[in-house]
């Protein structure tokens, strides 16, 4: 604890009412936000001479100032605490890294509605189903619906401008409503069945499909009967996978597990007795190391963190603590509806609870095992580089382009716990000779390290460059120009066979050349980081190239600016469909005159 902070003097004037407290260090950086039923009693507990966990002791040692806000009750304190945590993200609080809105299945209005994934505000007209706990869970449901009922999932702009069915029709994933290959009444029936499935009425849907199958067979419509038989078989398979015996309501099953290496919270989402999916959360554990504290902090941030998440009627948890009564009041007050938190459960609910606990334990064990695996590779690299201790931060750069087109440089960052994706960066390379990888790398490194020198970001301990002597020399020139000190430069080039395991490595200056055995953990780490930089560069390049190619063909046409280009491509569903359109069809697009349509058509067919 700093000498400038006197806890005795502070506690002498501290209120014993409910409220929120904020702890700051000597630089006025917010360290921790907490709530209390009795502020004075809670804050006094921090300054006991014994009994602190290591993280709590580290926090107390940094305190230079404490501010408090008195509230009318504990519920108000909890709501204010969550607002401050979300705004400031203090380092000693438990923090959820996931803050995205959860996805829904969206069914649009119209004669031929579309099924799609939706995040964010529900502004479009139609129906929303969910939320689903992950994008993977929602894609699984959409894939099943596509196979079973063949409701379209294409963009409206693509749908409106088809003159022949697409590949989805050929592989029996769509019935071709875009070109009139299915009657509106038949399509509406498929949509109705999809809605029944999404609402969790799978048993009623199975009964209805079975009855329709028997009716079709009696009418000797064997083709229709076979189609319905396949739908029933698919549906039964999914029911077996997703059903929760004895469950009919909307329930979230949440289990928290904590050990010295970290924490995991596993959430299973059940809607209408059907499992929509599950998700692991690995919160940044602050000073609360008890599993009950982790659970209450998770639920508070999950349901009060500002993200639009559906409130289930019941949440089953594996642990509770004294904060739960105030937590339930705060959630119900904030969300405007009742919710039950259950802990001591029996029968089916007890099995759900245990399943969530098992998943949380296994997920954390797997995460820690992977972290230890990466850490051991860092230790091996330290031996190779003759370092006293493992490096804490590695950066790797790569270049991707197609014959010089849409050049993108990538920067990926790794630490002993694995990739640090929040620090990944891409650089769109401009103003260099097409295909000049040296110039592209020079520009990327200059931009990156100029920003770091200006205080934006951290210097790595090791800079890994994917390339041979030329790239190494160029990287060294950049570091010298910018006067970047004490940075280990490591180059990796493919060997003569160009196979993994035969790489040639260069250390600091290109003259220091060596290789590592194919089974070397240090080499495996280098390969892992290099491959990740390559992947990140390629995905960025493809996105940039696709955007360029979608617009470049239209850029030289007088009267077609950026807005019209975007509107044209959106109207026709892409450049390929626009190229197939006639002059009259182009003229029907919003804001396009007959004369401009003729000019667009002529430019698109000039070759």
From Swiss-Prot:
PROSITE patterns cross-referenced by the UniProt entry: GIY_YIG, UVR, UVRC
Domain UVR: 203-238
Organism placement in taxonomy: Bacteria, Pseudomonadati, Pseudomonadota, Gammaproteobacteria, Pseudomonadales
CDD domains: GIY-YIG_UvrC_Cho
Family matches, as Pfam families: GIY-YIG, HHH_5, UVR, UvrC_RNaseH, UvrC_RNaseH_dom
A GO biological process held by the record: nucleotide-excision repair
Protein task: The UvrABC repair system catalyzes the recognition and processing of DNA lesions. UvrC both incises the 5' and 3' sides of the lesion. The N-terminal half is responsible for the 3' incision and the C-terminal half is responsible for the 5' incision.
Keywords: Cytoplasm, DNA damage, DNA excision, DNA repair, Excision nuclease, SOS response
Membrane-spanning ranges: none
Protein name: UvrABC system protein C
Domain (GIY-YIG): residue spans on this chain: 16-94
NCBIfam families in alphabetical order: PRK00558.1-5, uvrC
Subunit organization: Interacts with UvrB in an incision complex.
Keyword DNA damage: yes
Cellular component terms (Gene Ontology): cytoplasm; excinuclease repair complex
GO MF annotations, alphabetized: DNA binding; excinuclease ABC activity
Gene expressing this chain: uvrC
SMART domains registered for this protein in UniProt: GIYc, HhH1
Family: Belongs to the UvrC family.
InterPro entries in the record: GIY-YIG_endonuc, GIY-YIG_endonuc_sf, GIY-YIG_UvrC_Cho, Hlx-hairpin-Hlx_DNA-bd_motif, RuvA_2-like, UVR_dom, UVR_dom_sf, UvrABC_protein_C
Source organism (scientific name): Pseudomonas syringae pv. tomato (strain ATCC BAA-871 / DC3000)
Compartment list: Cytoplasm
Superkingdom, taxonomy of origin: Bacteria
């Amino acid at each position: 604890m700093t000498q400038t902070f006197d806890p005795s003097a502070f506690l002498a004037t501290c209120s014993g009412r409910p409220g929120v407290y904020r702890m700051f260090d000597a630089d006025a950086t917010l360290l921790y936000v907490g709530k209390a039923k009795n502020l004075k009693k809670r804050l006094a507990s921090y300054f006991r001479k014994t009994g602190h966990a290591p993280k709590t002791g580290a926090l107390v040692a940094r305190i230079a100032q404490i501010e408090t806000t008195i509230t009318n009750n504990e519920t108000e304190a909890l709501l204010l605490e969550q607002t401050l945590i979300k705004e400031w993200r203090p380092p000693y609080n438990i923090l959820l890294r996931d803050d995205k809105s959860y996805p829904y299945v969206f069914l649009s209005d119209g004669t031929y509605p579309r099924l799609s994934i939706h995040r964010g505000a529900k502004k479009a007209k139609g129906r929303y189903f969910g939320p689903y706990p992950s994008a993977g869970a929602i894609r699984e449901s959409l894939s099943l619906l596509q196979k079973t009922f063949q409701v379209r999932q294409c963009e409206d702009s693509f749908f409106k401008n088809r003159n022949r069915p697409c590949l989805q029709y050929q592989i029996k994933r769509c019935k071709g409503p875009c070109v009139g290959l299915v009657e509106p009444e038949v399509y509406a029936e498929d949509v109705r069945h999809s809605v029944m499935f999404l609402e969790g009425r799978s048993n009623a849907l199975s009964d209805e499909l079975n009855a329709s199958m028997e009716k079709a067979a009696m009418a000797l419509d064997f083709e229709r009967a076979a189609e319905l038989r396949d739908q029933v078989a698919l549906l039964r398979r999914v029911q077996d996978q997703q059903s929760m015996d004895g469950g009919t309501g909307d329930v979230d099953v949440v289990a928290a597990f904590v050990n010295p290496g970290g924490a995991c919270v596993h959430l299973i989402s059940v809607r209408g007795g059907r499992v929509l999916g599950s998700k692991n959360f690995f919160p940044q554990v602050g000073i609360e190391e008890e599993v009950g504290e982790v659970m209450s902090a998770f639920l508070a941030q999950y349901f009060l963190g500002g993200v639009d998440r559906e409130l289930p009627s019941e949440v089953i948890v594996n642990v509770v603590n004294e904060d739960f009564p105030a937590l339930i009041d705060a959630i119900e007050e904030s969300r405007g509806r009742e919710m039950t938190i259950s802990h001591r459960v029996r029968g089916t609910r007890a099995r759900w609870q245990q399943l969530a606990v098992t998943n949380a334990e296994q997920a954390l064990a797997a995460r820690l095992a992977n972290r230890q695996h990466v850490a051991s590779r860092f230790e091996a690299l330290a031996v190779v580089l003759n370092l006293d201790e493992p490096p804490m931060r590695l950066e790797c750069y790569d270049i991707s382009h197609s014959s010089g087109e849409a050049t993108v440089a990538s920067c990926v960052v790794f630490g002993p716990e694995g990739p640090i994706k929040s620090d990944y960066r891409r650089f769109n390379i401009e103003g260099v000779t097409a295909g000049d990888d040296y110039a592209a790398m020079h520009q990327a490194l200059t931009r990156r390290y100029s920003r770091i020198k200006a205080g934006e970001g951290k210097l790595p301990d090791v800079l890994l460059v994917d390339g041979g002597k030329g790239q190494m020399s160029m990287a060294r020139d950049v570091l010298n120009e910018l006067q970047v000190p004490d940075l280990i430069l490591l180059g990796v080039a493919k060997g003569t066979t160009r196979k993994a395991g035969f790489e040639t490595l260069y250390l600091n200056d290109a003259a220091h050349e060596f290789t590592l055995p194919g089974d070397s953990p240090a080499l495996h780490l280098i390969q892992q980081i290099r491959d990740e930089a390559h992947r990140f560069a390629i995905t960025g390049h493809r996105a940039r190239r696709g955007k360029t190619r979608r617009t470049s063909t239209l850029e030289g046409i007088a009267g077609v600016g950026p807005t019209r280009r975007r509107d044209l491509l959106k109207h026709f569903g892409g450049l390929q469909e626009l190229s197939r359109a006639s002059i009259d069809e182009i003229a029907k697009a919003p804001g396009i005159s007959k004369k401009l349509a003729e000019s667009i058509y002529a430019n698109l067919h000039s070759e």
